[in-house]
Amino acid sequence: MVQPKVRGRRAEKKSKEVNTQPEDYSPNDRSELEENDDKVESNPALKTTFFGLVDSNEIDYFKQAESTLNVNAFDNDEEREGFIRSVLEEARGKELKLVTNQICSKLMERLVLFATDRQLKNIFRQFSGHFVALAHHKYSSHVLETLLVRAAALIEKELVNDFKQDEGEVDDEISQDNDREDEAVVSMETLFVKMLDEFNPHLKTMVDHQYSSHVLRLLILIIAGKELPSTTTSNSTLRSKKSKIARKMIEIKDNDDFNRSFQTPPSFKDQLRKLCNSLGSKGDMKHMRELAINKVASPVLQLLIQVEGIVDKERTFWHLIFLSENSDKNPQEEAFVEYLLSDSVGSHFLESVIRNGGARMKYIERLYKLYMKDRVLKLSKRSTTGVFIIQALLFKLKPAEVLFILDQIIPELASLISIDENQNLELGKNIIDASISRDNYRREELIEQLFVKFAPNYDRHNPSADTSSEFLENTLHLTGSTLGNTRDDWPTAQERRRSLFLEKLMEYDHSFVVCTWLNFLALPIARFIQMCYHGVFSHVVENSLVVIPASEGEPKSVLIIRKRFLNLFQNEIVNLACNSYGSHIVDRLWNFTVLLNMYKDRIGSELASESHKVKESTYGRLVWKNWSMELFVRKKFDWKSLVKNQEEEYFGVGSHEGQNSTERVKKPIELKFEQMMKEKQMKEERAQKAEEGFNKRKNNEFEYGYDNDNKKAKIRGRNR
């Protein structure tokens, strides 16, 4: 039989690539993974199934229907439901060939998203017996994923007895078989379990299949009761990067059933156990390790390790990849871990099993102590592989080990971060977070390292007015950026990463904020104004508009720099207020001008002088409202009262007289602690009152002689 042609140039290129695995870890020429691929090709059930062609007239109709649903040009939901019923009626009996057609599969996916519960069951039944073939198809696999998410929501609805038949549906929606009444009452759980039984013999071949592996991942998430991720977000565990981009291009949006988890019936736990047993049976360590570094199969194994603890306390999949927690260093395991630490797919696998849970803490600690602890700094220099594992370990290991990693990295942080190559920016942010979580461990040294790297000529203890713009240039690379381009260039991903990194520095310590102000002053004013209108750099300007809290006290030198920085916005307030990016900056200026009433009044006067232009703009109206400009124009005294209230809030002063003006603003944690102490005191008082009442009743019983039935008994004699 003629072998099917391998699809795509990437597959051909991949077959010509030279194996780059370490010498210690080298699979045989004919690995079990390749044998498994041969089994897929030889399995008749997994061959491309032909369900028929859609003729040109049908394609035109369904394409028009898809466009109608896309624009959603319906007056109300009832009109849309009627349209969907008519399209489903036209598609009856053609569902299988529609989902395998490139154009019509988009229509079927939209129909699944908008279908009622009863229509959803009917579509599910039409796919029965063909789920395996549909999961292995390029187009129908996407429709099947959407159908499974909707099915999970319907299962939860049936569990809480909230499933109702829609009154507006007609009898033609159900099949014309004699037993249609029986089909209508079959639960979604029963249909889902039947589908799982259909998949069960083919699970091992689905693990590393280009399309069905995504379906398998979704099945694991559903039966484990985990959150079903969005299909369009960049960090989704469900779709590939290319698939998410394509989904955005065809404008298919998720409904409310995505980005949440669903309640599952008890039978799903048995199904999860059955699925894990099927995938883990007759598995050997060599084959599992090959799957762990396989681009397609690796995400499936990550999920299996994450959920296997629900049904398997022995953690079979973990021990099919790594040795037990009591084992010593093993040469083969060491070579495999080294490959994980140096390979892009392998490092993503190891990072995921560390970060997302599933693996026991003692398993992770063993790998860290045996194979990573003595070379933390070396791994941190692998900016595309090993550094991600170190970042994951920072938030998983015990405090002592985290401090050890910080001791290794902080002294060398300046040499690890490279803005030119966009290397280890995330490492810098995670080191800051780890230091904060450990009571600001080595904070001063960390700040000093960052200034040595990005502003070596700046003295943060004595900021001077003759500071250059080296800090902004070293962090943002303004020269050569899209700043000032007139071709409407989109900001690049590198610019976005650099901006987020600088914003993290300013959030970490106010000395970075002051340094940023001085760098803004060193720039040409036109260059600074361009930053205010830039899609990414405007966020840097916005986040630099922060004032030192009154509890810490703002030095006079910093106050002078703040005034000089505010002068840069003069005569540009109106244009900024009418811009989508600049309006956020003007909003921030309200709090940034605290204690500087002259500057606040000047900004208000600029807005009032061109009030007509500001009010005509959508963004300008929001700025006008946030600055309370109606009071500024009509009731200036009330506006100044708002300014006075802002100053009192800044100093933490109450509105009533006689309160100390130097009272420090209490932090939220302090207010929460005071509330807890009050509640504790009230509980103690209630307990004391209850105890006093109990003792009083006991004394009465002793005095009047209560019996076991709490009845008072008369006592005769003089001792009564």
Swiss-Prot record:
Biological process according to GO: endonucleolytic cleavage in 5'-ETS of tricistronic rRNA transcript (SSU-rRNA, 5.8S rRNA, LSU-rRNA); endonucleolytic cleavage in ITS1 to separate SSU-rRNA from 5.8S rRNA and LSU-rRNA from tricistronic rRNA transcript (SSU-rRNA, 5.8S rRNA, LSU-rRNA); endonucleolytic cleavage to generate mature 5'-end of SSU-rRNA from (SSU-rRNA, 5.8S rRNA, LSU-rRNA); negative regulation of gene expression; post-transcriptional regulation of gene expression; regulation of biological quality; ribosomal small subunit export from nucleus
Recorded family membership: Belongs to the NOP9 family.
Subcellular location: Nucleus, Nucleolus
Keyword Transport: no
Compositional bias annotation for Basic and acidic residues: 680-701
Single GO molecular function: mRNA binding
Keywords: Nucleus, Repeat, Ribosome biogenesis, rRNA processing
Gene designation: NOP9
InterPro entries hit by this protein: ARM-like (IPR011989), ARM-type_fold (IPR016024), NOP9 (IPR040000), PUM-HD (IPR033133), Pumilio_RNA-bd_rpt (IPR001313)
Each Pumilio repeat, start to end: 90-125, 126-161, 198-234, 278-318, 332-369, 371-407, 523-560, 567-605
Name of the protein in its database record: Nucleolar protein 9
Superkingdom: Eukaryota
Protein task: RNA-binding nucleolar protein required for pre-rRNA processing. Involved in production of 18S rRNA and assembly of small ribosomal subunit.
Compositionally biased residues, Basic residues: 1-13
Organism: Debaryomyces hansenii (strain ATCC 36239 / CBS 767 / BCRC 21394 / JCM 1990 / NBRC 0083 / IGC 2968)
Alphabetical list of Pfam families matching this protein: PUF_NOP9
Principal location class: nucleus
Stretch list, region Disordered: 1-40, 680-720
Cellular component terms (Gene Ontology): 90S preribosome; nucleolus; preribosome, small subunit precursor; small-subunit processome
